[in-house]
């Protein structure tokens, strides 16, 4: 069975950011992450290749988007985790297709969905200029 890190396209980056995660969140078994520096806050001086941001609602998406994009390397891997509809933490304005205006307005669109656990899903965002199969759904004014 693939680990969450494998599902999230982790490629051996030495330093990553995992922002706003719940205290009980486990990214991977300890043996798998012991050589990775995991920042729980974005270091404004560090450009990240791999970043995971947890958002309980669209206001948290709005809050974390500017610093996440500012510190994401060109075509870095950016995941936003959000509560599943079946979770008690679910927000009516945040799901796979809604609540991502802050990212969409900056030309970042959801390209891949991954199951994190029973309460969370993760949506990978990528800048439109790196999306090979850009279709009409990525045109300006279309919120995902």
Regions found by a protein language model. Name each.
Residues 4, 129-144:
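Flexible, glycine-/basic-rich loop-and-beta segments that form/coincide
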Residues 8-21:
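Conserved class I S-adenosyl-L-methionine
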Residues 23-29, 88-90:
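Short, charged/polar "capping" segments at the starts of alpha-helices
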Residues 37-48:
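Short acidic low-complexity segments
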Residues 51-61:
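Short, glycine-rich nucleotide/cofactor-binding loops
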Residues 62-96:
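Mid-chain, well-packed structural core segment of small domains
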Residues 93-112:
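Conserved Class I S-adenosyl-L-methionine
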Residues 122-130:
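Conserved beta strand-loop-helix elements of the APE1-like EEP
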């Amino acid at each position: 069975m693939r680990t969450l890190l494998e599902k999230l396209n982790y490629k051996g980056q030495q330093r990553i950011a995992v922002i706003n995660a719940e205290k009980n969140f486990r990214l991977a078994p300890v043996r798998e992450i012991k050589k990775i520096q995991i920042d729980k806050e974005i270091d404004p001086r560090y450009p990240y290749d791999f970043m995971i941001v947890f958002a309980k609602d669209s206001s948290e998406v709005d809050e974390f988007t500017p610093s996440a994009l500012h510190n994401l390397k060109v075509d870095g891997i950016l995941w936003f985790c959000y509560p599943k509809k079946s979770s008690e933490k679910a927000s009516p304005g945040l799901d796979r297709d809604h609540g991502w205006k802050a990212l969409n307005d900056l030309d970042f669109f959801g390209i891949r969905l991954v199951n994190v656990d029973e309460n969370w899903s993760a949506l990978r965002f990528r800048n439109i200029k790196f999306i090979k199969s850009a279709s009409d759904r990525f045109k300006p004014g279309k919120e995902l």
